[in-house]
């Protein structure tokens, strides 16, 4: 109170000394209609609006996240959540008062017209006589008539030789019961039935001379 009274006394003294010529300037500077006071009010208003917008955005994001998790929105903020399909459709068409038909078929004790049947309490399936029979698709034949009447020759069949068990990759098996061993000598190999002969192996130098000749 002392500071305010001191300012008022100073203003009155200035008015008396200056013959009330500066009264308008002093009143505009110290009065409630000054430019600094108005700018402060606008700054507070802008900060308040920004805080409200941030709170609304945060609530919208939180409700959207809770809806994805299957939880209810925050109490009192359900109007911030996006509308459901049926709700948005009613708002678009303007048929809020008119009751729309449910997309889910009505549950009855017996099978509906388009149901194939139903299961009883014991788990046995009972077909519905009212359901229309749908024929299965026709079977696809492996060999059509076009391939039979075509002029293309089929691939040759693979025929195995009668003695395929005795020959394998050009290797012959001896007809006798005894198989030559590595430790057998030349004389023992010659005594074996079948006339087993030995093959002469030429050294590398002699093989080169034979190849040139």
From Swiss-Prot:
<dbReference type="InterPro" id="IPR020999">
    <property type="entry name" value="Chitin_synth_reg_RCR"/>
</dbReference>
<comment type="function">
    <text>Regulates chitin deposition in the cell wall.</text>
</comment>
<feature type="transmembrane region" description="Helical">
    <location>
        <begin position="40"/>
        <end position="62"/>
    </location>
</feature>
<dbReference type="GO" id="GO:0043231">
    <property type="term" value="C:intracellular membrane-bounded organelle"/>
</dbReference>
<keyword id="KW-0812">Transmembrane</keyword>
<keyword id="KW-1133">Transmembrane helix</keyword>
<keyword id="KW-0256">Endoplasmic reticulum</keyword>
<dbReference type="GO" id="GO:0071555">
    <property type="term" value="P:cell wall organization"/>
</dbReference>
<dbReference type="GO" id="GO:0005886">
    <property type="term" value="C:plasma membrane"/>
</dbReference>
<dbReference type="GO" id="GO:0005789">
    <property type="term" value="C:endoplasmic reticulum membrane"/>
</dbReference>
<dbReference type="GO" id="GO:0072659">
    <property type="term" value="P:protein localization to plasma membrane"/>
</dbReference>
<comment type="subunit">
    <text>Interacts with PMT4 and WW domain of RSP5.</text>
</comment>
<keyword id="KW-0472">Membrane</keyword>
<dbReference type="GO" id="GO:0043495">
    <property type="term" value="F:protein-membrane adaptor activity"/>
</dbReference>
<keyword id="KW-0961">Cell wall biogenesis/degradation</keyword>
<dbReference type="Pfam" id="PF12273">
    <property type="entry name" value="RCR"/>
</dbReference>
<feature type="topological domain" description="Cytoplasmic">
    <location>
        <begin position="63"/>
        <end position="213"/>
    </location>
</feature>
<feature type="topological domain" description="Lumenal">
    <location>
        <begin position="1"/>
        <end position="39"/>
    </location>
</feature>
<protein>
    <recommendedName>
        <fullName>Protein RCR1</fullName>
    </recommendedName>
</protein>
<feature type="compositionally biased region" description="Basic and acidic residues">
    <location>
        <begin position="203"/>
        <end position="213"/>
    </location>
</feature>
<dbReference type="GO" id="GO:0016192">
    <property type="term" value="P:vesicle-mediated transport"/>
</dbReference>
<dbReference type="GO" id="GO:0006033">
    <property type="term" value="P:chitin localization"/>
</dbReference>
<feature type="short sequence motif" description="PY motif">
    <location>
        <begin position="104"/>
        <end position="107"/>
    </location>
</feature>
<feature type="region of interest" description="Disordered">
    <location>
        <begin position="190"/>
        <end position="213"/>
    </location>
</feature>
């Amino acid at each position: 109170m002392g500071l305010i009274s001191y300012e008022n006394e100073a203003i009155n003294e200035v008015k008396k000394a200056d013959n009330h010529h500066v009264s308008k300037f002093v009143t505009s500077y110290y009065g409630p209609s000054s430019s600094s006071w108005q700018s402060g009010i606008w700054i507070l208003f802008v900060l308040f609006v920004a805080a409200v917008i941030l709170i609304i955005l945060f609530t919208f994001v939180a409700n959207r996240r809770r809806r994805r998790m299957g939880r209810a929105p925050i109490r009192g903020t359900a109007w911030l959540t996006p509308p459901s399909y049926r709700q948005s459709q009613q708002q678009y068409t303007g048929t809020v008062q008119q009751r729309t038909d449910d997309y889910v078929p009505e549950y009855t004790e017996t099978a509906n017209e388009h149901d194939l049947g139903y299961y009883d309490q014991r788990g046995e399936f009972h077909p519905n006589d009212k359901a229309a029979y749908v024929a299965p698709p026709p079977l696809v034949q492996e060999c059509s008539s076009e391939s039979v009447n075509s002029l293309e020759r089929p691939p040759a069949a693979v025929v195995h030789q009668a003695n395929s068990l005795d020959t394998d990759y050009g290797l012959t098996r001896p007809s006798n019961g005894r198989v030559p061993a590595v430790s057998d000598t030349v004389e023992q190999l010659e005594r074996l039935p079948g006339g087993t002969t030995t093959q002469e192996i030429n050294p590398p130098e002699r093989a080169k001379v034979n190849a040139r000749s």
